[in-house]
């Protein structure tokens, strides 16, 4: 499970045997979320047990680090989508 980074007590990562589309998982504080890259923007697809204020921070971190996430995906999986 390649972890890309940690912020606010949350881990941002991919699973080793991922599938398309390009996406990122977030886990921490007994919650989880998944964001898919849709038309050049990460969109929330799944969320469980994450407070709305934490979700807002997570989305900001993802938006500010979008290029890093995409580069890590391409490096690990070999393609963008």
Regions found by a protein language model. Give the residues of each.
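C-terminal structural segments of small proteins and small subunits
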Residues: 53-81
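Aromatic side chains
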Residues: 10-15, 35, 73-77
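Generic preference for hydrophobic/aromatic residues in regular secondary structure cores
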Residues: 4, 43-46, 65
């Amino acid at each position: 499970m390649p972890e890309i980074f940690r912020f606010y007590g949350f881990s941002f990562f991919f699973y080793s045997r991922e599938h398309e589309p390009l996406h990122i998982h977030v886990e921490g504080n007994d919650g989880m979320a998944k964001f898919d890259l849709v038309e050049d923007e990460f969109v929330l697809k799944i969320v469980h047990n994450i407070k709305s204020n934490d979700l807002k921070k997570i989305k900001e971190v993802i938006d500010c680090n979008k290029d890093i996430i995409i580069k890590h995906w391409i490096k690990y999986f070999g393609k963008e989508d």
